[in-house]
């Protein structure tokens, strides 16, 4: 038979574990998913928010600050369907406090995408087939990103991040890079050949 003191210790330990789980729950990272369009002209987004009554659509600026952006096809979805919202200044929307999934569509300027959050998020970016990331001169994945290449798309994921960025390219840009590199190499060979020819002539 266990002593009452030991039983009380087990109960206290169990209570502490439950309390820790409850306190840690709000701190768990939420999910945000972005899908780049086939023509890379824009993207669709789905972002979870918890205990929220507003959301601002932003992207990182040159100094890492949050810069408001214009988006369209906004939907705020709750447990029982779509929820009405009001548009405010600086690309912000407001709605009744609660947990929601916010979806929208944004535009891309060039072959790059970046996003910024005020709290940690699990971020997933889906890049369609025909675009690549692996060449360090043309492609880029921000710190913490994990790249998984599938049959018709590339999936990039981050866990618990406030910032995510990718820069991608297509085969045409890769061909241009190789062509430029070849021209530059030929140009350097011609210069070096001329230089050594002049030195040889001066010695004679």
Where do the language-model regions lie?
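Hydrophobic secretory-pathway targeting helix
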Residues: 1-34
């Amino acid at each position: 038979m266990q002593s009452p003191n030991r039983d009380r210790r087990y109960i206290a330990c169990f209570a502490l574990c439950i309390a820790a789980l409850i306190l840690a729950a709000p701190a768990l990272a939420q999910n945000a998913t972005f899908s780049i369009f086939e023509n890379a002209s824009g993207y669709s987004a789905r972002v979870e928010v918890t205990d929220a009554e507003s959301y601002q659509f932003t992207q990182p600026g040159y100094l890492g600050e949050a810069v408001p952006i214009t988006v369209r096809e906004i939907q705020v979805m709750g447990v029982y369907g779509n929820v009405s919202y009001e548009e405010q200044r600086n690309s912000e929307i407001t709605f009744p406090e609660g947990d929601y999934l916010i979806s929208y569509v944004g535009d891309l300027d060039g072959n790059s995408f970046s996003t910024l959050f005020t709290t940690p998020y699990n971020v997933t970016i889906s890049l369609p087939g025909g675009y690549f990331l692996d060449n360090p001169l043309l492609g880029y994945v921000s710190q913490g990103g994990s790249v998984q290449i599938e049959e018709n798309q590339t999936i990039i994921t981050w866990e618990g991040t406030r910032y995510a960025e990718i820069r991608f390219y297509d085969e045409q840009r890769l061909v241009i890079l190789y062509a430029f590199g070849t021209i530059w190499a030929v140009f350097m060979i011609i210069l070096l050949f001329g230089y050594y020819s002049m030195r040889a002539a001066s010695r004679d």
